[in-house]
């Protein structure tokens, strides 16, 4: 097994993957990620960065100026946009590293890993929070948690989620450090040598942590809440626009990050699935890189979903660019306690 693991500048896994240049058990040519990295990643990541930066800043502006942050869901939408922006800030650096074949020295190595990881985990957690908020609204349990729906309560929960996402990324932060390789710095996984466990254990631990917190937890929340809501007659009879938006955002997140998490799991535990042969290793390494590139583009998708599924957002966007002739909308007030999510959504 390799002593180090390349980080995203090799356009491989930021968390746990083995060095792709290692010799396999069978004599064969290993997969070289640098070919696809140099040809595709710089252009794709730069495009995603520019598009994502523009549309997520627009989301933040519209939420703050027009829709207001008095409703708990709007606060969560704002935090989702901030999560995307944090993730986006790392893409130009990975694009540069892919095109030049080199990484970064301290402290930039750890800063980029921190932004990348916090952006990913915080988006997963805020997606879960939004889903649970819609679930409680649907089954009219809002009054039991009325304190959580105040501005102060929403801010407290948001801070708690950000702190949790930061704490979750600490293992990556302490286990990565820049190393010199071929007279170039690389941001490598070196393991947690101050704890009594070998590198294989931490490789499996970090993989399972990402799979559980970044994929299985949102998947469970999505399936449980959606199935329970789908069974009720009210859900089938009424078209809840805000419900549709929240669950579509979660579904897209799962669809874009799901393949990467599955392939990552198979790659980390390949010895348990008889996937350590030459051909299997080659295909797994290639799949990890491709699915990771696809997943990294998710951070510019949410604002597009707002445009297609949120009438109020389209109206505010229209007024912002002077495409509408009627009077510009005013900032939205918090709905009354008895108002439904749909009534607020259509009037905001």
Curated annotation (Swiss-Prot):
GO terms for biological process: calcium-mediated signaling; cell chemotaxis; immune response; inflammatory response; positive regulation of cytosolic calcium ion concentration. It is a multi-pass membrane protein. One of its GO terms (molecular function) is C-C chemokine binding. Keywords: Cell membrane, Disulfide bond, G-protein coupled receptor, Glycoprotein, Membrane, Receptor, Transducer, Transmembrane, Transmembrane helix. InterPro entries: CCR1-9-like, Chemokine_rcpt, GPCR_Rhodpsn, GPCR_Rhodpsn_7TM. Residues 1-43, 98-110, 172-204, 266-292 are extracellular. CDD domains: 7tmA_CCRL2 (cd15171). Glycans are attached at residue 285. Receptor for CCL19 and chemerin/RARRES2. Does not appear to be a signaling receptor, but may have a role in modulating chemokine-triggered immune responses by capturing and internalizing CCL19 or by presenting RARRES2 ligand to CMKLR1, a functional signaling receptor. Plays a critical role for the development of Th2 responses. This is Chemokine C-C motif receptor-like 2. It comes from Bos taurus. The lineage of its organism: Eukaryota, Metazoa, Chordata, Craniata, Vertebrata.
């Amino acid at each position: 097994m390799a002593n180090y693991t390349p980080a995203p500048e090799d356009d491989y896994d930021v968390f746990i993957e083995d060095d792709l240049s290692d010799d396999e058990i069978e004599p064969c040519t290993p997969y070289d990620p640098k070919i696809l990295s140099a040809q595709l990643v710089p252009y794709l990541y730069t495009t995603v960065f520019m598009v994502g930066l523009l549309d997520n800043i627009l989301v933040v502006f519209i939420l703050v100026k027009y829709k207001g942050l008095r409703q708990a869901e709007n606060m969560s939408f704002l935090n989702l946009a901030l999560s995307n922006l944090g993730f986006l800030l790392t893409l130009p650096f990975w694009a540069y590293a892919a095109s030049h074949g080199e990484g970064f020295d301290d402290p930039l190595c750890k800063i980029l890993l921190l932004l990348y990881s916090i952006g990913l985990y915080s988006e997963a957690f805020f997606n879960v929070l939004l889903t649970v908020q819609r679930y409680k609204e649907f089954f009219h349990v809002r009054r039991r948690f009325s304190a959580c729906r105040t501005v102060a309560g929403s801010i407290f929960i948001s801070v708690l989620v950000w702190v949790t996402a930061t704490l979750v990324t600490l293992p990556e932060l302490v286990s990565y450090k820049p190393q010199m390789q071929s007279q170039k710095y690389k941001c490598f996984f070196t393991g947690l040598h101050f704890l009594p466990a070998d590198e294989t254990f931490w490789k499996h631990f970090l993989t399972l942590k990402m799979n559980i917190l970044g994929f299985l937890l949102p998947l469970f929340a999505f399936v449980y809440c959606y199935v329970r809501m789908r069974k009720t007659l009210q859900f089938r009879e009424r078209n809840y626009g805000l419900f549709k938006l929240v669950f579509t955002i979660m579904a897209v997140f799962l669809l874009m990050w799901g393949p990467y998490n599955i392939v990552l799991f198979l790659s980390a535990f390949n010895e348990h699935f008889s996937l350590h042969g030459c051909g299997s290793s080659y295909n797994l390494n290639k799949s990890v890189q491709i699915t990771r590139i696809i997943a990294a583009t998710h951070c510019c998708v949410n604002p597009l979903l707002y445009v297609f599924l949120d009438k109020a957002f389209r109206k505010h966007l229209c007024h912002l660019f002077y495409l509408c002739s009627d009077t510009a909308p005013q900032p939205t007030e918090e709905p009354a306690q008895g108002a439904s999510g749909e009534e607020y959504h259509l009037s905001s």
